[in-house]
C-alpha cells in the first residue's frame, strides 16, 4: 500500500511551504512528523466543514485529495483490523512503539553514524540525511530510513532516530 505525501512544495513558494509544514515536524523523527500532520488534519476535519477545510489545506500547502486518500486508507485498515478481531490502541503509541512498528519493515534501511558524520548502512552503503528531514542537524547515532535517493549523494529521506537495542529483537 502506498499513498503520496500530502505536503505540497510548489517551486515558486518553497520557503512558505516549508514554514507551514514546520508546525508538524518532530526533532527526532520524520515518521512522527507525519503522525503530527495526521492529528492536525483530523482536528481540523472535525472542527470545519468541507470548504473551510479545503482552505485550511491550501493555506498549509496540503493536498486535500491526498489527505482524503489517507483517511480512506485509515478507514479500510481499521475495518480489516476489526474483521480480524484485532484491537485498536486505546492510547496513541509512544515514540518507541511507533518506531519499533515501522522498524520491523525497514531493518535493511538502518544506518550507524560514522566519524565523518555520514551513515553506514547495509552492504556498506554510505549515505547522508536529506536536507529536508526534520532531524538533519541532530545526527543521531542510529537511524532508520524509509527511502534512499541518489542525487549528488546518496540521501536518506523520511528518517527517524532509533535505539540500537531495538534492532536485534526485531530482526
Regions flagged by a language model, labelled:
Residues 1-171:
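Second RecA-like catalytic domain
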Amino acid at each position: 500500500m502506498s499513498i503520496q505525501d500530502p505536503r505540497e512544495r510548489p517551486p515558486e513558494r518553497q520557503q512558505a511551504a516549508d514554514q507551514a509544514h514546520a508546525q508538524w515536524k518532530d526533532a527526532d523523527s520524520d515518521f512522527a512528523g507525519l503522525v503530527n500532520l495526521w492529528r492536525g488534519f483530523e482536528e481540523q476535519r472535525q472542527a470545519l466543514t468541507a470548504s473551510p477545510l479545503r482552505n485550511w489545506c491550501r493555506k498549509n500547502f496540503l493536498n486535500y485529495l491526498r489527505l482524503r486518500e489517507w483517511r480512506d486508507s485509515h478507514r479500510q485498515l481499521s475495518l480489516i483490523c476489526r474483521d480480524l478481531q484485532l484491537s485498536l490502541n486505546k492510547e496513541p503509541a509512544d515514540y518507541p512503539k511507533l518506531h519499533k512498528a515501522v522498524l520491523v519493515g525497514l531493518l535493511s534501511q538502518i544506518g550507524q553514524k560514522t566519524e565523518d558524520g555520514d551513515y553506514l548502512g547495509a552492504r556498506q552503503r554510505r549515505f547522508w540525511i536529506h536536507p529536508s528531514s526534520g532531524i538533519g542537524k541532530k545526527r543521531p547515532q542510529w537511524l532508520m530510513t524509509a527511502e534512499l535517493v541518489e542525487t549528488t549523494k546518496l540521501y536518506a529521506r523520511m528518517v527517524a532516530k532509533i535505539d540500537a537495542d531495538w534492532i536485534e529483537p526485531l530482526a
